[in-house]
Amino acid sequence: MLSLAHNRSSPVVYTTYQMYLKQSPQRLETDLARASQKGLVFAAKLVRGAYMQHEREEAVKRGVEDPIWPSIDATHAAYDSSARYVLQKISEGVDAHVMLATHNQDSISQAVAMVTSEGIDQRRVSFGQLYGMKDYITFALGSGGFQSYKYAYIRLMYFVLNLLLLL
């Protein structure tokens, strides 16, 4: 893991957690505990995900259970509970940073409320949206003192269109 080599004193490498995968909440908790035990800075980027079709095709090829949550509501629940988990750990003093990459207003509002109510250092929490989408969210977060990023999705048009259909 690159984070083992590079996250010794600051968050350099962020691990992306595709929250549409059933395994992601447990994987995130395990990785956070492992980083903390090793004295590393934990850095995570939470996304809902964009590779569902590929994941399902791979599961069928391997003859394993569908790795995707059964509904969008289950994916939302996994995303929001994992965001709360990381924010809670940060509020408890765990050396962690999280980027919440989402366009979902409810998820953002919940996270901002928790950061505010728990007195979490805003430098440990950042947000990201796709370039050209939901600019009003990005600007409002930035005006509120949060690190807020735009990211460009550079890939074949087929993949980009599939991603946009999920938003």
What is the predicted role of each segment?
Residues M1-L167:
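Positively charged, amphipathic and often flexible ligand-engagement surfaces
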